Structures are given as C-alpha cells and as structure tokens.
Amino acid sequence: MSIEFSSEGTTIEYKKAKEKFPKSFWETYSSFSNTEGGYIYLGVSEGKSGYEITGIKNANDYIQIIVDQANDKEFTNFNNISMDNIEKNEYEGLEYLKIFIPEVSSENKPVHVRNNINNSYIRRNDSDHKMNNDEIRRYLRDANPKSDAELLNNYTIEDLDIKAVRRYKNLIQERNTEMDVLSMDNWEFLKQYGAVGKDRKDNKYKLKKGALLFFGKENSILEIFPNFHLDYRNKTHYTEDKRWLDRVSSGEVTTEEINLFNFYNIVLDKLVNTVLEGFVLNETTKVRKDTKMDVEVSLREALANLLIHSDYEDNSSIIVEAYKNNYIFTNPGEMLVTKEEFARGGESKPRNLTIVTLFRKAGFSERAGSGGMKIFRVAKENKLRMPEIESSEGKTKLKIWKIDLVDSYDDLKEEEKVILRFIVKENRKVKMKEIQALEGFTEYIAKTNVNNLISKAIVMKFGEGRSTRYGLKPNSSEMIANIEHTMRNMQESIVDRNR
C-alpha cells in the first residue's frame, strides 16, 4: 500500500534531499515560523503520479544538522525546533523525515536565518518569499509594540474634539450615577480616566497617543499618524453601478470629526440598522428578536476589537463592510494571539492599552479577551455560519455571518443543500445510508452530491470502511468554539443540578 501525500501548500513543503541536506530547508523553517507553521518532509519529492518517497542517505545525520543549526545563535535568532516535532519514518527501506515547525509568538518574529534579519521569510501559497523592508518593520513593531500611552509634546486639549469628550463624559456619568462627572473640568476628567499622563521628566501632564486617536481632531491625528484612515461601506445592495448605499470615511468633509470614538458610535448605529438584511424567513428559520440582538452583540464586539487591535503605524486603512449576508472587518496588523485563543477567549494581547481602557470604561468592551468568544458563541447558539478569521501579510480580516451555513453558499445545487441541511440538523457525523434515505434520493444521487460537497471543502469524510461517516469540515477556530460551548453547557447543567 502506497502512502498518500497532500499537495504542497501554505503548511506543507516537500524536499528531495537525497544526496545532501538542502539549504532551502532554512528558508521554509523561517517562513513557517513567521506564518502559520507547517510540515517539512525531507526525502519526499514530486513524481509523475504525485508525491513519492525518494529517501535520504542518513536520517540521523540530517536530524543532527537541524538540531545543531537551530541551536546556533549565530545562525538563527530563534530555535523553533523540538525533538518531539521531528519524526523519522521508513517505507520500503527508504528513510524520510517529517518535521513540524510551529508558528512562533509575535514577540519572536521575524525568525531569520544565516545571522541576517534580511533573511526573514513568509509563506505564500506553496513557496517561501523573502520579506521586504516594510514587512520586516511590521513584524518588529509587533515584537516590541510602541505603547499608545506614549506622551505627546506640544499637544493640548485644543487638539481634541470637545464634543466627543463631552459625549464620553455623559456615558461615564450614566454608568457611574453616584459620581458628579459632568461638573469635572475636561482636562481633569481626561487625567482621571486614562487619556492624559504625567511626564516624569518635566512633571507636566500630556496627552497620550491613544487619547489623540480616540478623541482627536482629524488634522491633529494625521500629524502623528499620517496614514490614519477609517472607512465604513454599506454594500447590502451592491451593484456595479452603485458600489455602496452609505459610507463613513475619514478625510471627507462631514459635520463630525472622524476619530475612534465618533467612528465607533456612528458606524455601530448604521451596522445595527442592517441586521435584518439577509435573514431568510421560512417555516424552519424564523427571525427572532433575540437573534437580532445577539447579532448586534457580535457587531459591537467586532467593531471594538477592530479599533482596539489595529496597527495605527501601518499604511493601510481600517475598513468595515456590510453585505447582504455578512460583515467584514479588516484592520492593519496581524493578531497577537492565535485564532484558537481568540475564539476560546481568555487570552488578550492588545496593541493599544490606552484605547482598550477608554473603550472599556465607556462600556463598549467588557473584560479582556472575551470579544472573540462572544462572537463565536452567538454564531453557535443561533446556528449561523461560523465566523472566519484570516490573519497574515500584516492584516487581520474577520467575517461575521448573519445567515446559516447552507444559505451562505450561493453555488450549491438543491440536492447538496438538502444533504448539508440534514448534517447540520443532526449535529453529528452521518452514514451514507442515512443520506440515501432522504426523500427523493438514490444511492447515485447521495454519493455524487456528497462527493461534490467534499470537493468544495464543505463536508469531510471520517473513518474507513463500515465506520465511514460524513460531517462538516471544521476549521480550527470553530473546533475551539465548539469545545468552549460544550464546556459551558456542562458547567451550566452541573449548576442546575446543584440548585
């Protein structure tokens, strides 16, 4: 029986390596470390009928080379090799190695080789690409982020939108009715609530960078952050003639200064007004008031998350897009936690602590690390398509759906939709015989359409022979969200039994 290998891609690399250890191993080592991680196979190469084992001369010698060079601080800045992740295999007398290279944390990027930071690589599709200077600088910023608590010389309350400060004071007053916030002097208020700090060098109080972003006048913000750009587009009825129905964008003439506080409030109201767009009304999928409210919770968390975690030193825009069936939030800066940690909750590494503080004190964002968990929980509990996260190439994109999984695919045939609805309804892996038993189905119809769903990467085959089952193909963040959801249900049932 031959061994089947998946095609090369973002997380898989094959190297022939038969006669000598390949120098290109280290480019892939760097790119996997800096991107999503992956597997390097040594002794496997592409043949006429796919990938085949060609073997290596001495696996132990190769392992020693890998371990020695990974530990050499004059060769690479970070050892990302664990002996537990090196697997020696043999097939028909041929040895080959399978080495897992995990993605490293942001503080250790960029991983470079040959003692030169310019030898830093990222993975794009099935190849390793040397980073350009902008990409290297971006990773260095994430490794040692400049604090948005940095104090600004020569900036005063005159650089802030006083109307925004007053509205913020009103929010604080509503949340703290026992305090007389409204009568406080604006500058004293900003000191007390974290927007202003004391410079120990000259004992003067000065604006923090994050406060300028949060409350500032656009012209003042642009002096410090020349690439600052916020953009909201309503594309719920997108056509070639009409690219958006509504837009809010910094840099345009408006009655409001577009800082983070004003953008959040204006755009959240607009997003909430689009929630009912795209919901399907039928006997099995009813729009309930609590579903609408839950989706609004997701939008609030996603919008706050977008503004809190953006890299404002970058040269790309912060974009919010509302479509008929989903919302897309795009920000400069990769996630500083893994997708799994974001979905599970609990872990938080915000880039901008001052902005986090200002959002939280206004009630726009709750405890640290809970936003992603809420977003995934809303989708799970309301049977919506699970959120999708992409974080690479210096950007993070979060897509939130407001319809269920089946309706989110426009290109499915009716038989494929029936099968998918059945799997979703059963909430388990199903047998082919169960699919064949669906009304109007035959063995041929069932197998053909299941294979179509597998080829579209929507459904996955589990097991072999008589134990074969078919279920949804999960992504990693969805699996973590499912685990979190199950654990919470178990905890709630234990509490109920003990009441």
Residue map of PLM features:
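Short acidic, hydrophobic short linear motifs in intrinsically disordered regions
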Residues: 426-438, 499
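Polybasic/polar functional segments that serve as interface/processing modules
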Residues: 1-40, 44-98, 105-107
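Intrinsically disordered, low-complexity regulatory tails
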Residues: 77-158, 314-317, 366-369, 377, ...
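Short, cationic-aromatic polyanion-contact patches
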Residues: 464-486
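A short, conserved structural fragment
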Residues: 196, 454-464
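Short amphipathic alpha-helical interaction segments
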Residues: 440-452
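Glycine-rich/acidic phosphate-handling loop/turn and adjacent ATP-lid/helix
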Residues: 327-363, 404-416
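Active-site helix-to-loop segments that bind/position phosphate- or nucleotide-bearing substrates
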Residues: 123-314, 322, 330, 336-348, ...
